[in-house]
């Protein structure tokens, strides 16, 4: 018997919009909203996890700070404080009675005027939250996923502002993801404009060779991921070295292991790139150690990082 998944708009629950809780089905904007036409908006992806102490949001303050930084880069003045947005995210998780789930804050430009310039328009903010499991599949978390290098190139750092988690930037990700999933792969890898590895369609990438972990530096156009930063802390705790450098595709082909990271992807092993098996073709030992340490942290089992968890 197939399970019917409700559409994103037709659900019970509450969404926080511009300071008010509204019924899920009533959370609407006008079709002439500026962001809908020109793509200038910013968002975050945040996760809440079930812990022994209760439901907690992982690295809430850092996600909210990045949202505000993205808005600043896009010259959007969010009409709320970071503390108010933090409170809104906690409230949405409570209102929707989530033990764990995904949280989506989004800021957009309103419908006061239309035209390329948004000057004088209104800025809005919403926060939604819902239950969401493993982004790239539960099996992929253990076995690893199949990845293909996309024919699409990641944005140059001076074409779009790559350190903004901007709505418009994800057209590039959408095209890359559709291209490779249509061919049966799980996710896309994108190169930068010089042909070096940048990141996945929605994830940062790490590569393991001879016990050393490598990841592209941010000049390759990759987003400064919060899960990426978390892995740096985990690696230090485990006595593992991380080197930020330019990485070529063929370095991944001959790597021992590779994995994606992201709020949605969490820590997902990569078993294959471009039909070439990586290492043993399964989750490697370094990846497994990092993955285990990550889930210990987000589920409240590592007291060293209790400050990263905000109870709702």
Protein language model features and the residues they cover:
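Short, acidic/charged, Gly/Pro-enriched secondary-structure junctions
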Residues: 85-100, 104-113, 130
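Helix-start/capping segments and mature chain N-termini
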Residues: 1-80, 87-91, 114-312
């Amino acid at each position: 018997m197939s399970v019917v998944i409700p559409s994103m708009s037709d659900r019970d629950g509450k969404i926080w919009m511009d300071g008010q809780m509204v019924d899920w089905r009533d959370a609407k904007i006008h079709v002439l909203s500026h962001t809908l036409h020109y793509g200038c908006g910013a968002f975050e992806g945040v996760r809440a996890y079930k812990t022994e102490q209760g439901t907690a949001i992982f690295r809430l303050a850092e996600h909210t700070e990045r949202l505000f930084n993205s808005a600043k880069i896009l010259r959007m003045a969010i009409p709320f404080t970071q503390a108010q947005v933090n409170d809104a995210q906690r409230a949405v998780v409570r209102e929707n009675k989530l033990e764990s789930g995904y949280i989506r804050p989004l800021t957009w430009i309103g419908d006061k005027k239309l035209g390329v310039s948004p000057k004088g328009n209104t800025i809005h903010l919403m926060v939604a939250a819902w239950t969401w499991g493993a982004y790239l599949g539960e099996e992929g978390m253990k076995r690893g996923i199949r990845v293909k290098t996309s024919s699409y190139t990641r944005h140059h750092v001076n074409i779009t502002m790559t350190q903004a988690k901007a709505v418009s930037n994800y057209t590039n990700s959408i095209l890359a993801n559709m291209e490779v999933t249509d061919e049966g792969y799980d996710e896309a890898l994108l190169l930068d404009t010089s042909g070096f590895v940048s990141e996945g369609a929605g994830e940062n990438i790490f590569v393991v060779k001879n016990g050393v972990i490598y990841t592209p530096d941010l000049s390759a156009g990759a987003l400064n991921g919060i899960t990426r930063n978390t892995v740096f802390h985990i690696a230090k705790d485990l006595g593992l070295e991380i080197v930020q450098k330019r990485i070529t595709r063929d370095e991944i082909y001959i790597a021992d292991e590779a994995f994606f990271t992201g709020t949605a992807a969490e820590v997902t092993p990569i078993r294959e790139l471009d039909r070439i098996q990586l290492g043993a073709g399964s989750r490697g030992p370094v990846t497994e150690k990092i993955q285990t340490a990550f889930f210990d942290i987000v589920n409240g089992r590592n007291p060293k990082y209790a400050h990263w968890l905000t109870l709702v």
